[in-house]
Amino acid sequence: MLFRSLEIPEKRRSHIITKDLFLFACYTGTAYADAVSITRKNLFRDDEGSLWLKYRRKKTDYLGRVKLLPEALALIGKYCDDTRTTLFPPQDYHTLRANMKSLRLMAGLSQDLVYHMGRHSFASLVTLEEGVPIETISKMLGHSNIKTTQIYARVTPKRLFEDMDRFVEATRDLKLIL
């Protein structure tokens, strides 16, 4: 079962918020401390009208910038509330961790599920696997050092095969002299 399609009863609002925060991390690469403190002031439009998230990381104070995917925009829209300064409802980390454990069981996942996996998923599956250069991913994640990004962004088998196919195609007519 895909985590994003997990049905959660309305009476479990706290679990719904946790699921949405985790999905937001998958679509933006934000850490928990950053996601729960993002406000409308962190959103801006580029010259083409696309909405971006621009924020200073709580952990490092480095700038993170990421263009918001439609899925992330939908999550922001779901929680639009003029009375709250943050984009998402507040949720303390202990509640989030407990809810992540419950959601893992509800989804039938055997592996532990922690919020930070969303950040790793963004780096590996959403960006690197789709051909975004690791240098760009590093800027999106707000890293000061590409070595840190390499911990997050793992090359998947799919990406490896696609890169090798491109390499073989590019070198097809190349005559190597050994």
For each feature predicted by the language model, list its residue ranges:
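Conserved tyrosine-mediated DNA breakage-rejoining catalytic core shared by Y-recombinases
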Residues: 3-5, 28, 37-75
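Basic, Lys/Arg- and aromatic-enriched nucleic-acid-binding interface segment
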Residues: 3-32, 36, 130
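Short basic/aromatic active-site micro-motif
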Residues: 16-21, 93-94, 110-130
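Short, cationic motifs built from Arg/Lys/His that form the positively charged side of catalytic pockets
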Residues: 17, 30-31, 59, 64, ...
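C-terminal catalytic core of tyrosine-transesterase DNA break-rejoin enzymes
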Residues: 23, 27, 119-144, 151
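Catalytic-site neighborhood detector that most strongly recognizes the C-terminal catalytic loop/helix
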Residues: 57-61, 141-166
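Active-site/catalytic core of tyrosine-dependent DNA strand-transfer enzymes
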Residues: 69-110
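C-terminal secondary-structure termini that scaffold catalytic or DNA-interacting sites
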Residues: 166-178
